[in-house]
Amino acid sequence: AAALTMAWFRPDLYHRVLSYSGTFVNLRNSPEAPLGAYEYIENLFPSSEKKPFRIWIQVSESDNGSKTGAEGRRNWVIANARFAKVLKEKRYAYQFVYSKGAGHTQRKVINNTLPQALEYVWLDYTPRR
């Protein structure tokens, strides 16, 4: 969730987010974020104005926590799929890639998807002059 966090708090600087196996789960929480990074899914994105983001996210079938249920909010597969659903509902420019038969950030997945991911997040980019 690090790339997303940078964009969320500094949308004036960051508009493009590329995430492999995004940690949108409840690993660390605080009084300000009782659900940890799951706050993006549960509260921040649903209740906030749309930001100028272009987001590409990927998760693998056998990613971290894939054998656990949703109740603990520590399943990367469920969290990334739910995040994609929130992005769709808010009409963000996003792509969600689900890699069947793969595990957490496997090299073969990155090798096969990184070119397309970079093309997607930089689509329609015009440099400032």
Name these PLM-found stretches.
Residues 1-129:
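Non-catalytic cap/lid and distal C-terminal segments of serine-dependent acyl enzymes
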